């Protein structure tokens, strides 16, 4: 495939089949060779900054026309836009993945079943990962790098709005990895290819969608392949009665304003009634100065109307606001009677993504953190910390709000599964069955697989 868009003669089915074949070889590629390939990807991206920017500028120009037509938001275009510094950050991200410990071949458990009968639980790649993402061309590189490091083949389907950017970045990856099994990374571009991908449950082991809540929901509803992702990021910050209000103002500002377009930005601010007047007088001025639109419940509106030092205008919040991921400089505010009410509100309207309590009372914080149902729950910290890099996981492929396999920011570990290796010496099950069955030891011990004899 060329940058200019020459049609790839392979069908989506053929590409997935090739990826399935490549996955078997890729799982046995040494750590050193995978890391060398990742370093080569970073170098190739840096050498092609002008080529990448040219393609991205064309994508952005088309997207800006869609903003004018009311089809896209400016936040959507912001996610699409690349810059020299952002491309440099992408290259550094790839290098950071290369520098991480190998997630493969780790012995999670070693258990002696009997003399010379030892069981090992060892990490292995998942296999073939299909990913469908919107607007962010950097996601293509991020997902490819993490897939390569974890020994997985990957099928990449980006949005048409980033077609040129995705194509150039994909070609950079292929140019950098001639020593990696052919077919390990595949780019599909046609809209109808998405449905093909979702139907190939015999070849694709995991689907990772990244995009709007409706988009992710569509993927979940139209495949029998396991889906790792989240439909939306309706994150809350609760300002408790025992909060340090100066801290609370700073954290709530960061959680909304630092980068409002991402899924870990706060969308709803809950405020205990005892501190609401004093807190809102500080908070609303800061939000106004940052251009944040405020939508408040009746109690919030009443405080604004009665407090002489609050001059900001607010919009009446509707029921829909409590379940909306704005992805923009908009925040909804509700005043609550108690900590329990805050917890109940979050568990009713939240998306199980990231929630935060601001309080100086550790007992109240513990109650909140135990009771709130979310992948990440914070105490006195911005919701924006819900990120694989900030968690020390390296780059992430996304955030999962599910509870099976992986939860929260998903890095390399989330792209592996495990295999059981049993090392024996001719043992038979009959020995351990019947009236005179030999008992198992089931004793865990410290040893890694593979086990090497002294003579090699």
UniProtKB/Swiss-Prot annotation:
GO MF annotation: an example: glutamate-5-semialdehyde dehydrogenase activity
SUPFAM superfamilies: ALDH-like
InterPro entries: Ald_DH/histidinol_DH, Ald_DH_C, Ald_DH_N, Aldehyde_DH_dom, G-glutamylP_reductase_CS, Glu-5-SA_DH, GPR_dom
Localization (cell): Cytoplasm
GO cellular component: cytoplasm
Keywords: Amino-acid biosynthesis, Cytoplasm, NADP, Oxidoreductase, Proline biosynthesis
Any GO BP: L-proline biosynthetic process
UniProt enzyme class: oxidoreductase
E.C. number: 1.2.1.41
HAMAP family per UniProt: ProA
NCBIfam families, alphabetized: PRK00197.1, proA
Job description of the protein: Catalyzes the NADPH-dependent reduction of L-glutamate 5-phosphate into L-glutamate 5-semialdehyde and phosphate. The product spontaneously undergoes cyclization to form 1-pyrroline-5-carboxylate.
This protein's name: Gamma-glutamyl phosphate reductase
Biological classification of the source: Archaea, Methanobacteriati, Methanobacteriota, Stenosarchaea group, Halobacteria
Gene for this chain: proA
